[in-house]
Amino acid sequence: MVFTPFRLRELELKNRWIMLAMHTGFATGNALTERDYAFYEERAKGGAAAVTVLLAVNEAGALKGMYDAETVEKESLRTLAERVHAHDCRLIVQLFHCGRNESAKNHGEKPLLAPSAVASPIFRTEPQEMTAEELAKTKAAFANAAALCKEIGADIVEVSASAGYLLSEFFSPLTNQRTDVYGYQTENGMTYPLEALAAVRAAVGDFPILVKVSAAQMVEGGYELTDTLRFCKKAEDAGTIDGVTVTGGWHESPVEQISYHVSKGGYAPFAGALKKYLSVPVIACNRIHDAETAERILSQGLCDFCGTARAFLADAAFANRLQAGKPYLPCQSCNKCIAAVLKGKELFCAFNPEAGNEAFEHQRRKIATRKECIVIGGGPAGMEAAKKSAERGFVTTLLCREKELGGQLRLAALPPKKEGLLDYIAYMKATLAELGVTVLTETEATLDFIKERKPYFTVVATGSQPEKQPIEGLSDEKYFTAQEILQMPEEKIAEMLQGTVAILGGGAVGLETAAFLAQRLPEGAAEFGIKIIEQKEKMGMDMGAMARPLLNELKKKNVSFLTTTTATLMDGSKLYVKIGEMTLFVSADTVIWAGGGEPVVDTELTMWLMDERMSYAVVGDANEIGDGGTAIKDAYELYTHLYLA
């Protein structure tokens, strides 16, 4: 079903894949640039039935780096529509107002406007309660923006009333404390959003209009699914909408929305609940990143279209590759894209560094000759380097010491809910084969090998290794690295879990290793048999919001946490730790190092390359310790700055 056409009003869309709105942060002036055009055109070319671009209705409602309808150069929007239409793809423009959901720092001198002066728990900036004049102007801005979109050749407008942005703030008693006609006590706060939709309809006539809603606020005391249904039904009965896009909750919801902690298509039943009572088409959202999920929710009648933003962010040709049965770069739902946007940074994908750089890629794709490049290392940096090397025209050979490509990503895929990383490795393996890269596994990059081949260019991507903190009295028999634990035979893990375990390091590695072990805890295991010891004030500081669901899961498994704590001494099964000026001990039959590492570089090889004046570069963890995303970016950026004679 996913590749069958469907209609929205009188408008036919070629398939059921809708690329949802994403704030890119690319705007630096009032006119869209080639960077914007290339970003959306690649996804139109990649098989989306429609792509959605964000447009704030006015300057006050714009996020940092967002175009707004009051100041945007009209002809640049028209150019975008033409570029998208050239690929049998429709253009949706989402009409947006941030409301209170922006930081004062990023909003500049513009006041944050909201139904009431209630600060967002994310940004902690108190907005101004909108006056009657501001309400009228904003409503007119929605109408004017819609008229502009129709004029420049867009196909559909989508009115944003979701995720905690302005219009959705009227629905909630937590954010709408007004006492006038637009207050929550009047029609549960639906009056103003319904009037905004009516103004948009009056401005565009029979032009297709979508409304994007959160199925529920998913915050204690907030609005529920039944409230959202009533709103959508009122809008449908008034003739102001032609379809509904249904997402999950708000950004501040304690319930996970789009991370890998959410099951695939997990929020589609909310779309199905609305579809049961509405006659207009419904677009489902959240964690719909593969054909199986899309076919399932369509066949179950939960929706008419499948909306996804990040599947197209990860792979611009996502839909075309699916239809052709080809491998595609899968979204990992790591949420690093969302984290960047919420911090006022530009949109990016940790696993697809070309996202946002499509215009540059078009100019630079074939800069190399048929000279040889050897890439040493089969981890994320090595695979990306080999990919870009081949794309740039090098005859490329990748040397991998292990039996399989992937490096430390193979270990990172072992904790619960991280198996998607194996799909990324499989995609890269297929891509390298398609590009003609020679991959030599179980092959050491010896100095003799490099001397014999004398490649034009060598990329050293040999990764890193753990560097255990020495602890007095702790022997190797009891002291392991997280990497050793993840590779340990199951029977040895089971034996280890009969005792107590202390993990040194409460970052991503430590927390995910704890989850890996907690999943294997035997019945009747000692309470708090796994302890995580972290020197910093918080656990998971390198994970951002992704730490919260993982910490909750670990708490359910009785994993205990010690912060601002340093391990100092081991005596038998007593691990002495220092918390401020206080020293105490915790029980630990096994200690696991989940802290930092050190780069691995063959200095003899690199010195020889230097002495022979042969071109080489060191990338990824071998250059600077980071994570998989930074390693991939490092390798990618090497080739953006590589110029050949």
Language-model-derived ranges and their functions:
Residues M1-I376, P380, E384, K388-E391, ...:
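Flavin-dependent oxidoreductase catalytic cores
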Residues L20, Q94, S160-S162, S168, ...:
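Generic beta-strand/beta-sheet core signal
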Residues A49, D155, D242, D304, ...:
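Conserved acidic residues
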Residues D88-C89, F207, V280, P455, ...:
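A short helix->loop->beta-strand "cap" motif at the edges of active sites that frequently abuts
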Residues V244, L274, I297, A309, ...:
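Hydrophobic, well-ordered secondary-structure elements that form the walls
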Residues I367-L398, L440-K451, A461-K478, Q483-A545, ...:
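Rossmann-like dinucleotide/flavin-binding elements
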Residues L398-L435, A515-A567, N623:
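Rossmann-like dinucleotide-binding cores of NAD(P)H-dependent redox enzymes
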